[in-house]
C-alpha cells in the first residue's frame, strides 16, 4: 500500500527514466531545423567529425544528441522515415545497455539505427541479432542504405556463408545475424590452429531483436559442435543381450539397508541379478549379478579398469530395460525412429535424443537401427555467450513479465517505452468450453462470421498440428485462408504482411511471423515486389503507387469493421506469448480486438484448476456449446501461467549454475589457447610444462620421508616411457635433495630437447610444438566435456545424500579440470620427446604424377596443391 502511494506521488522508476530521456529528445528535436539545412556532403561528414572527437577524448554520451539528430535526418533523406520521439527514447535505452519494450508496429528496426550508428563510431563493431536468417538479411538490406550514406559498412552472417565472407562481415562496422551463427562462430574460432582462421573480432556491443525469444525461450538449449565418436554400436547390442538374460531382484530391493540384508542371510535363490530404485531412478548390480555377467562375457573382473566403458554400456542397457517404457517415455515410429515423449505435455519431441548413450541403448532394446553416438567438441549456453559482450541490450514487444529473469541472468533492466499513439484495441474476456469439440465448433463459427463480415482475422494456435486441424475444417466450409508455420521464414513474412487485408483469414502458430508488421489493408511494398523483381526496377515506383492507393482504400474498409481480430485457440504456458499474439493487433493507434477460446481439455486447463471451473459449469447447468466467462477464470489461468513460468525459470537458472562452472574452465582453456596462437615460439612454454611435470612426478615418487623408501625404479621407468630418458648414475638420487634431483633431470631433458631441435631444425621444431600442443589440448578438452556430461548425469543422485548437486559438481569438476591440465602438460611434452619425423627427401616424380592425383608425400592432398606447387 505504501509503495502504491509513493508511486502516485513520485511516479514509477520507469516513468522517471522516460521523463529524463524526454529532456534529451528535446535537445535532438532542437537540432532538427539546423540539420535539415545541411547538404548531403555536410551531413555525411558528420561521421568523420564524430570519429575525430572520440579520438580526442570525448565519449559516446558526449556526442549522443548530435549523432541521433544526424541519423534521424539521414533516415528522412534515404529511407523516407522520420524517427518518432518515442523511437529516439527507445534508442537511448538500447545505448545504455538495457532492454526496451516497445509494442508491435512501433518500428523497432528503425529504433536500433541510432544506437547502432553511435556505437559503431568507436570502431569496435556492433552486432545486431535477429531470430532467423530471413530477418537478418532483410534488416541489413534495408538499413545498409542508411549506414552506407553515413559512411559505415555493414555485413550479414548467414548459414552456410564461406569463411572469407564471414570474416569480411565481422570486420564491418555493423554485423547482422542470428544468435546461433554468432555463437557457433565463437566456438569454431576457439578450435582453429592459426589466428588468420578466426572470423570474429572482440564482442563489443550487441542489440538483440526479439530479446525474450532469444535470451529466454532458446536459453535452455546450449550450442553444441559435435563430431562422430568411435563406433560402438556392437557394444550396445551385446550389452542389451546380456541384460536380457538377467533377472531383477524384487525381493531384496524392498530392504533398503545393506547391513540388514547381510544379517538376514537371504537365500541365494531370492537374490536377483540387479536391484532397481525407481524413485531415484538408479539400478545396481548384486554380487550374484556381477558374477553372472562375468560368466556370460567370459571375463575375470567386471570392475577392472579396462572394463569401465563396458560397465557404462551395461548400466545404460539396464536403464533402457527397466526405467524407460515404450509409449510412456518414448515411441517408435514405423521407420524405426525412437522419439522421446515430453513428460509434461505428452508430445513427441522431434529431433531430441537422450544423452550419454541411453538413446542407443533404447534403440538396441527395440531392435531398430542404432544411430552412431556423437562426441561434443565444443559447447556454450546462450546465456554465457551473450554475457561476454562488453555491452548488451535488446528490444521486444513483451519483456516486462520476464524482467526478474533478465536482471538475474544478464543484469539487464527493462524499460517500457510509451506507444507513439494510444492503444485502443479491445481485449475480451476468455471463453471457456467444457470440451475441445465444443470449442473448435465455436471457433469455426466465429471465423466464418468474421469472414462473411469482411473483418480480417488472425487465428493463433500453439502447435502446427492444431493449425492443420483448423485448416481442414475451414476447407470444408469453403473459407479461403492461409496457414503459417515457422518453416519458411521468407514466405511467412509475405503472408503475415497481408493478414490485415479485407476478408483475410490467417492461421499461425503463436511464434510465427514475428518481425513483420500486419498493416491494415495490406502492405503495398510486398504486393509491388510480387509483381516486379526489386526496388531498383524502373517500374517499381509506378507499381508501388498503384498498390499504395489500393491498400489505402482497403484500410478504410477494415477500420470501419473494427480492425484486425485476434482469435487465440488456446492459452500458452507463458503470458508473454499470449501478449505477443494480442500485440499483432492495434498497431499505431489502429482499432482491433482479441479473444481467447479455451476448453477444460486444453493442457493448461487440464493441469491447473479445471476442477473448479467444472464445478461452476455444473452449477450453472450450461447447455452444450455454451461457454463461461468470468474474471475468476482469467485470474486462475494467470496463476497457472505464473507457476509454469517460475518452473521454467528454475530450469534455466539451474542450467546456468552448472554451465557457469564449465564456463570458467572454458574461458581459461580458450584464453591460454589464444595466447599460444599469438606466439610464434612456444619453446619456453613447453619447457615450463616439462619442469612442472617433472617436479610433480619426483614429489610423487619421492613422497616418503625416508630416502631408502623413495621409488627410484618407478621414476626411472616413467622417465624412460615418457621422455626416452635413462639415468646413467643410479646412485645420484642418494646424493641429492629432491630439488637438486629435479634440476638434474630437467637440465638433462632440456639438453636432450635441444639436441632434437638441432637435428630437426628450429623451424620444424616450432611447428611441431604448436601442432602437438593444440592437438593435445583439443583432445583432452573434448574428453573433459564428456566427463562433465557424465558427471552431470550422475550428480543428482548426491542430492539424496543431503548434498547439494551444484556444490558437488563444482568440487568434482574442479578436480577433473586439474587432472586434465596435468595430463595436457604430460602428454604434450612426452609426444615432443618421442616424435619421429621422416626427413628423407621425396623423389622427384613430377613427370609421372597426374596434376589431380594424390601427392606421394602421404599428406592425402592433391599433388598440385602440395609438393607440386
Curated annotation (Swiss-Prot):
> EC annotation?
7.4.2.8
* InterPro entries noted in UniProt: Helicase_ATP-bd (IPR014001), Helicase_C-like (IPR001650), P-loop_NTPase (IPR027417), SEC_C_motif (IPR004027), SecA (IPR000185), SecA_CS (IPR020937), SecA_DEAD (IPR011115), SecA_motor_DEAD (IPR014018)
Query: Its membrane topology, per UniProt?
Result: Peripheral membrane protein
Cofactor: binding comment = May bind 1 zinc ion per subunit.
Catalysed reaction equations from the record: ATP + H2O + cellular proteinSide 1 = ADP + phosphate + cellular proteinSide 2
**Annotated residues for binding of ATP:** 87, 105-109, 517
Q: Which SMART domains match?
A: SecA_DEAD, SecA_PP_bind
Residues making up the signal peptide according to the UniProt record:
none
Domain of life per record: Bacteria
Whether Metal-binding counts among this entry's keywords is: yes
Q: Where would you find this protein in the cell?
A: Cell inner membrane; Cytoplasm
Write out the residues that bind Zn(2+): 855, 857, 866-867
Assigned GO CC terms: cell envelope Sec protein transport complex; cytoplasm; plasma membrane
SUPFAM superfamilies (UniProt xref): Helical scaffold and wing domains of SecA, P-loop containing nucleoside triphosphate hydrolases, Pre-protein crosslinking domain of SecA
Entry cofactors: Zn(2+)
What are its GO biological-process terms?
A: intracellular protein transmembrane transport; protein import; protein targeting; protein transport by the Sec complex
Pfam families xref list = P-loop_SecA, SEC-C, SecA_DEAD, SecA_PP_bind, SecA_SW
Q: Major location, coarse class?
A: membrane
Protein purpose: Part of the Sec protein translocase complex. Interacts with the SecYEG preprotein conducting channel. Has a central role in coupling the hydrolysis of ATP to the transfer of proteins into and across the cell membrane, serving as an ATP-driven molecular motor driving the stepwise translocation of polypeptide chains across the membrane.
What is its quaternary makeup?
A: Monomer and homodimer. Part of the essential Sec protein translocation apparatus which comprises SecA, SecYEG and auxiliary proteins SecDF. Other proteins may also be involved.
The entry's family comment says: Belongs to the SecA family.
Q: Indicate what this protein is called per its UniProt record.
A: Protein translocase subunit SecA
Q: Which gene encodes it?
A: secA
Amino acid at each position: 500500500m505504501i509503495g502504491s502511494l509513493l508511486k502516485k506521488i513520485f511516479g514509477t522508476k520507469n516513468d522517471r527514466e522516460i521523463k529524463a530521456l524526454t529532456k534529451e529528445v528535446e535537445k535532438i528535436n532542437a537540432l532538427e531545423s539546423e540539420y535539415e539545412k545541411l547538404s548531403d556532403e555536410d551531413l555525411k561528414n558528420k561521421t568523420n567529425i564524430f570519429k575525430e572527437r572520440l579520438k580526442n577524448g570525448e565519449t559516446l554520451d558526449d556526442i549522443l544528441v548530435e549523432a541521433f539528430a544526424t541519423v534521424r535526418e539521414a533516415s528522412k533523406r534515404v529511407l523516407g522515415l522520420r524517427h518518432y520521439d518515442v523511437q529516439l527514447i527507445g534508442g537511448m535505452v538500447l545505448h545504455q545497455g538495457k532492454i526496451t519494450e516497445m509494442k508491435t508496429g512501433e518500428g523497432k528496426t528503425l529504433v536500433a539505427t541510432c544506437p547502432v550508428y553511435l556505437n559503431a563510431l568507436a570502431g569496435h563493431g556492433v552486432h545486431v541479432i535477429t531470430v532467423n536468417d530471413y530477418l537478418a538479411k532483410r534488416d541489413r538490406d534495408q538499413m545498409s542504405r542508411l549506414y552506407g550514406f553515413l559512411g559505415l559498412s555493414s555485413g550479414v552472417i548467414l548459414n552456410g556463408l564461406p569463411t572469407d565472407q564471414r570474416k569480411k562481415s565481422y570486420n564491418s562496422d555493423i554485423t547482422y545475424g542470428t544468435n546461433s551463427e554468432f555463437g557457433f562462430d565463437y566456438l569454431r574460432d576457439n578450435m582453429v590452429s592459426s589466428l588468420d582462421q578466426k572470423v570474429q573480432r572482440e564482442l563489443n556491443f550487441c542489440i538483440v531483436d526479439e530479446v525474450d525469444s532469444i535470451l529466454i525461450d532458446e536459453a535452455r538449449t546450449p550450442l553444441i559442435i559435435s563430431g562422430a565418436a568411435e563406433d560402438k554400436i556392437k557394444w550396445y547390442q551385446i550389452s542389451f543381450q546380456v541384460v536380457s538374460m538377467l533377472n531383477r531382484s524384487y525381493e531384496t530391493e524392498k530392504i533398503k539397508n545393506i547391513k540388514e540384508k547381510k544379517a538376514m542371510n537371504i537365500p541365494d535363490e531370492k537374490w536377483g541379478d540387479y536391484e532397481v530404485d525407481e524413485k531415484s531412478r538408479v539400478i545396481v548390480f548384486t554380487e550374484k549379478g556381477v558374477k553372472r555377467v562375468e560368466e556370460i562375457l567370459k571375463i575375470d573382473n567386471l570392475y577392472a579398469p579396462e572394463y569401465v566403458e563396458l560397465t557404462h554400456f551395461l548400466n545404460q542397457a539396464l536403464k533402457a530395460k527397466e526405467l524407460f517404457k515404450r509409449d510412456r517415455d518414448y515411441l517408435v515410429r514405423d521407420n524405426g525412429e525412437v522419439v522421446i515423449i515430453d513428460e509434461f505435455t505428452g508430445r513427441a519431441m522431434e529431433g531430441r535424443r537422450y544423452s550419454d548413450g541411453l538413446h542407443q541403448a533404447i534403440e538396441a532394446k527395440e531392435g531398430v537401427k542404432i544411430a552412431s553416438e556423437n562426441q561434443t567438441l565444443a559447447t556454450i549456453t546462450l546465456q554465457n555467450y551473450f554475457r561476454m559482450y562488453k555491452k548488451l541490450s535488446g528490444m521486444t514487444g513483451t519483456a516486462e513479465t520476464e524482467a526478474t529473469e533478465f536482471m538475474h541472468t544478464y543484469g539487464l533492466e527493462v524499460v517500457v517505452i510509451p506507444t507513439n499513439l494510444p492503444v485502443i484495441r479491445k481485449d475480451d474476456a476468455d471463453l471457456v468450453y467444457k470440451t475441445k469439440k465444443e470449442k473448435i465448433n465455436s471457433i469455426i463459427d466465429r471465423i466464418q462470421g468474421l469472414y462473411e463480415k469482411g473483418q480480417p482475422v488472425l487465428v493463433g494456435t500453439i502447435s502446427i498440428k492444431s493449425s492443420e486441424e483448423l485448416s481442414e475444417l475451414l476447407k470444408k466450409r469453403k473459407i479461403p485462408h492461409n496457414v503459417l508455420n515457422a518453416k519458411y521464414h521468407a514466405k511467412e513474412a509475405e503472408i503475415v504482411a497481408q493478414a490485415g487485408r479485407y476478408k483475410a483469414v490467417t492461421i499461425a502458430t503463436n511464434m510465427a511471423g514475428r518481425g513483420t508488421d500486419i498493416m491494415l489493408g495490406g502492405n503495398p511494398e510486398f504486393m509491388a515486389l510480387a509483381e516486379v523483381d526489386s526496388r531498383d526496377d524502373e517500374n517499381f515506383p509506378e507499381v508501388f503507387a498503384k498498390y499504395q492507393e489500393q491498400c489505402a482504400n482497403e484500410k478504410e474498409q477494415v477500420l470501419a469493421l473494427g480492425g484486425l481480430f485476434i482469435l487465440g485457440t488456446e492459452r500458452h504456458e507463458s503470458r508473454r506469448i499470449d501478449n505477443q499474439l494480442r500485440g499483432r493487433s492495434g498497431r499505431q493507434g489502429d482499432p482491433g480486438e482479441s479473444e481467447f477460446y479455451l476448453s477444460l481439455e486444453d493442457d493448461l486447463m487440464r493441469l491447473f484448476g479445471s476442477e473448479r471451473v467444472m464445478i461452476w459449469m455444473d452449477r450453472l447447468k450450461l447447455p452444450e456449446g455454451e461457454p463461461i466467462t468470468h474474471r475468476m477464470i482469467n485470474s486462475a489461468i494467470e496463476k497457472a501461467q505464473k507457476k509454469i513460468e517460475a518452473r521454467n525459470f528454475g530450469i534455466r537458472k539451474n542450467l546456468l549454475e552448472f554451465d557457469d562452472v564449465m564456463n570458467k574452465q572454458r574461458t581459461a582453456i580458450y584464453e591460454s589457447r589464444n595466447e599460444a596462437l599469438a606466439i610464434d615460439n612456444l619453446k619456453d612454454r613447453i619447457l615450463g610444462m616439462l619442469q612442472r611435470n617433472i617436479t610433480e612426478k619426483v614429489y610423487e615418487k619421492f613422497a616418503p620421508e625416508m630416502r631408502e623408501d623413495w621409488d627410484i625404479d618407478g621414476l626411472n621407468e616413467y622417465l624412460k616411457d615418457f621422455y626416452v630418458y635413462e639415468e646413467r648414475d643410479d646412485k645420484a638420487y642418494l646424493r641429492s635433495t629432491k630439488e637438486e634431483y629435479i634440476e638434474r633431470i630437467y637440465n638433462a631433458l632440456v639438453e636432450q630437447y635441444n639436441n632434437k631441435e638441432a637435428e630437426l631444425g628450429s623451424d620444424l621444431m616450432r611447428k611441431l610444438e604448436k601442432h602437438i600442443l593444440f592437438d593435445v589440448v583439443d583432445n583432452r578438452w573434448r574428453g573433459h566435456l564428456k566427463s562433465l556430461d557424465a558427471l552431470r548425469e550422475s550428480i543428482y543422485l548426491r542430492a539424496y545424500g543431503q548434498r547439494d548437486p551444484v556444490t558437488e559438481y563444482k568440487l568434482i569438476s574442479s578436480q577433473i579440470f586439474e587432472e586434465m591440465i596435468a595430463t595436457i602438460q604430460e602428454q604434450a611434452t612426452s609426444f615432443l620427446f618421442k616424435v619421429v619425423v621422416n626427413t628423407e627427401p621425396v623423389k622427384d616424380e613430377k613427370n609421372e604424377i597426374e596434376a589431380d592425383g594424390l601427392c606421394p608425400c602421404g599428406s592425402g592432398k592433391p599433388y598440385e596443391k602440395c609438393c607440386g606447387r
